[in-house]
């Protein structure tokens, strides 16, 4: 018999999108990034969070109706990325190197993976912060 803790209640069921690894454009992104060394993919606050160690380097919405991929780049890469009309500065975190990109299908997934690879490499090189 499993011990029951007071106040825990019955947990919620896992949403189908989570159990399948995403839906819409998130699924191919999750499949690709899941094969990269050291990448951890976890749902957080309505978005897929892409981590290297404890460092968040990108996030994408869980809902298939939303398409805004957020990527954290180095400041040099951010300047390079913003030369492309399809990429815009993040509405709140542009000062920290974040950019946004609409990912609705295969053409944008290729572009996104190129910038995600740069973000992953930069995040993997950064030293872990002491907590």
Locate each region found by the language model:
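Charge-dense, helix-prone N-terminal extensions
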Residues: 1-131
